[in-house]
Amino acid sequence: AYDPVIAVGAMDWSFRPAYYTDYGPWVDIAAPGGDRYSGKTTRTASDGRTVFYSNAQILSTILCDDAIAYQDGRKDGGMYGYGFMQGTSMACPHVSGVAALGLAYAAQNGKKYTPAEFKALLLSSVYGIDDCFTGSKDGELGPIADMAVYKNKMGGGCIDALKLLFAVKGTPAVYVRTGEPVTVDFARYFGGDRSRVAQTAASFASPGNLGLSSSKAVFDGMKITFDCPEPGTSMLRISAVSGDTEFVREFAVVSRAGLAANGGWL
């Protein structure tokens, strides 16, 4: 790919490469592009035809002119003017949209970046998907026998808007697996000698977002043990003291059903 641009690969709903996507070491990042062969169901038009726009693709606005007799059911019922589509033309806008969101958030927080700095920030705001490249899947020209051929060829992972916003703000994000107990030592985020850091107060801003109750979070010094029954996000505010210096820091605790080896989420 032309080096100054960002090359985007397309993935399906199961985090695997879409059958049509290009791939290779030059791909920078992946994003949802849809894949009609990975859909579990299709939509049926009023005349009984199975329409092209299945729910394994990306919901998009589409041309809808009453003077044109379309053959794909796009004027049926509540779908008027909308359709499920697929392609890198769907994947690329995900990345450009997240980039625009990040730049707007940076302006709101008084942050400025050079193009190279923001590109690096954007491309590092991903979650790993290579572990999903297993088995086979259907494609336009027949089954794709071995999904492992895509490994290390779909960029650093799938674009993660939440991770980009945390990076812009400078908020540390702690990712945990939904439904599994975890103990996190937050002392390392306060610098210096960990043994001298003592917690004075800690609280989740929105514990309900994670399915947490007061009895499900155990605070032991700077270590917090908790189990998030629900996927979601909550800010965690910790007050601590090291010697005669007091600190207050906020963390984003993100609960996801699956975690990638690189610390991202699936």
Task: Specify the residue positions occupied by each region the protein language model found.
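Mature extracellular/periplasmic domains of secretome proteins
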Residues: A1-G9, R16-G34, G97, A120-S124, ...
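Hydrolase catalytic cores
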Residues: G34-Y150
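Solvent-exposed, low-complexity, repeat-rich "mucin-like" stalks and linkers
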Residues: V168-A198, G263-G264
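Surface-exposed or secretory-pathway low-complexity segments enriched in glycine-proline
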Residues: G191-M222, E250
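Extracellular/luminal low-complexity segments enriched in Ser/Thr/Pro
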Residues: G221-M235
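C-terminal edge beta-strand
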Residues: D244-G258
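Low-complexity, Pro/Ser/Thr- and charge-rich linker/hinge segments at domain boundaries
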Residues: A257-L266
